[in-house]
Every structure is written in C-alpha cells, then in structure tokens.
C-alpha cells in the first residue's frame, strides 16, 4: 500500500470571511458571558480541535490564530470607541478582553496611544 502525499489546501477569501464571522460571533458570546476570548475556548465554540484550528487559521490569514483574534478584538474596540459613548471598561468587556488592563495594554501596542486618546483624536 502506497501512501500519497497530501496536497496543500488552498484557502480563499470566503474562508477568511467565514473565520472572521465566527470570531465576531464568538466575541459576542464572550460579551454575553462576561468572559475573556481564548483560542482554546474559541476552538470549543466551533467544536474543533485547537491545534487543527490554529494550523488552519495560519493557512487562511497568515498569522497565528491568537494574533488574528487579538486584531479582531482591537478592531471591535476601535469601532466602539469611535461610534459609541461607552466607557472603556464596557468596551473592553464587549471586545472580549478579560480585564481593562489587558485591553489598555493591547490597544497601546496596536496604536501607541491609550484608548481615551484614540477617542479624542477620532472625534
């Protein structure tokens, strides 16, 4: 019996859109449960093996699932900062950050400014 090499799978823009949609649903779930977003829990949410999901996500988006999830959290926070008067602790919770300090740290890494300063600049 000869084993054939597996062809590398090609992912499309539609795959990325589905992943992003699943992340948005998961972040909504995190907000409803007041819990932090975690890769292992995201995999459970999708009923997938975490290692498989991580490998697949890297193939789809080119970065680790953790990094992509964090970027989506920051994008959601940006949207809420610029379109709502919500306080930062609510935005942190809604975007799936476990604590406000984690939110501030990640936001500063992404934008080199605090979320409040970002809101002022975007007014």
PLM segments and residue spans:
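…primarily DNA-binding HTH/wHTH and HhH modules…
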Residues: 3-15, 105-123
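An amphipathic alpha-helical interaction segment
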Residues: 1-24, 41-44, 48, 52
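Residue-level marker of regulatory loop/turn positions in helix-turn-helix DNA-binding domains and
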Residues: 12-16, 31, 35, 46, ...
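Basic, amphipathic alpha-helical hairpins
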Residues: 2-8, 22-37, 57, 61, ...
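Short alpha-helical elements of helix-turn-helix
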Residues: 17-24, 68-75, 100
């Amino acid at each position: 019996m000869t084993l054939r090499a597996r062809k590398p799978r090609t992912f499309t823009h539609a795959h990325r859109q589905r992943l992003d949609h699943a992340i948005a649903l998961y972040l909504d779930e995190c907000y409803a449960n007041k819990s932090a977003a975690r890769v292992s829990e995201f995999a459970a949410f999708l009923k997938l093996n975490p290692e498989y999901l991580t490998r697949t996500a890297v193939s789809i988006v080119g970065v680790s699932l953790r990094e992509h999830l964090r970027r989506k959290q920051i994008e959601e926070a940006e949207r809420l900062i610029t379109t709502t008067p919500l306080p930062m602790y609510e935005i942190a919770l809604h975007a799936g950050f476990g604590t406000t300090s984690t939110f501030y740290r990640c936001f500063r890494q992404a934008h080199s400014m605090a979320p409040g300063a970002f809101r002022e600049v975007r007014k």
